[in-house]
Amino acid sequence: TKDTILFVGGGENESPAVWALSGNTTQKVSTQAIDDILQRLTADEVADIYGWSYGQAGHYFVGFSLPDTCLVFDTTTSRWHERQSRVTETTGAIDTISYRVRGFATAYGRLYVTDSRDGRIGVADIDTYTEYDSVIVRTMATQPFQNNMDPFFLPYLEVTIESGVGNAACPDPQITLQISRDGGKTWSDERARSIGALGQYNRRAVWRRNGRTS
């Protein structure tokens, strides 16, 4: 941000973390989950981390590109998320790589981005749901639900969404649900719900009969 610098670092014999430097004050901003990802890197991989930043729609993001993923901090909400890109190889197989965007620049009323894979220039648009013709897949995991360690039933689950956002590229966007009953080690089959075609603003994403926890 204007008065703050974010960086990856750590003292001697300390594991790397993300820190915010504001004036003469340093504050750790990475969570335990982010620290766990950074601690798996070698010293050379930590040295090769590439940072970038940009602002859009009232949010200011700072990203750190790693070999297999990209860690992004939203300074407006103080929340983290990961970004990756899906690319189609010459064999037709779909591969997942670290977020391919490496640079941002605002010009002519648009936010332009650079591409680390083949050098193309793109535009970051919050109303576009593809990345270089590949559909963007977003994954969110909730905090574990528990009832004082006792089993419980989950008869009804609804995700509050902005519905009716389909467009020509994705006329019927979907949201899918998977449930883990063993702490995230295994997951149920996907159950899909429509987010709503363009104009279906009252569409709701509801899952019923979700079973019992063990």
Per-range role (PLM):
Residues K2-L6, G10-S214:
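Beta-sheet repeat architectures centered on beta-propellers
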